[in-house]
């Protein structure tokens, strides 16, 4: 279950610090580590802790919100356990709700091309009617000391609704 990160600020900070020098988290940290700011509001940045059935924090999800463009960008997604499919399901449901209910019109994010999670991002992009819109080659040096390619993705609400119209009450209302 996704809940406000502000409720678990100390635990999230401690768990994130524990990942700083672990190579498997290099794609989240992008070559450098510092404490994540979890402010006492959620106007520009939405931040969530993911809780398992026992109430343990097993993941963190965040994004920036731009009210002028009604869009979100700059995702942060990290699991503190190796296998966490419920976290992914919760994130996808959150994004689907935001798109289908009209809370946002656009999603953009990037990923390192060789990140194992990128395969999942590509499936999500296809499912949501989005597309890869760019690629930068050898643009970021990560913890492994290598330069990595970055790919950029974009999803528009209207494309999501066309692809997933049967799930979206808002789409049916717009068509009437």
Q: Model-found features: residue ranges?
A:
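Active-site rim helix/loop that mediates acceptor-substrate recognition in acyltransferases
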Residues: 26-52
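Acyl-donor (CoA/ACP) binding surface of acyl/acetyltransferases
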Residues: 1-18, 47-176
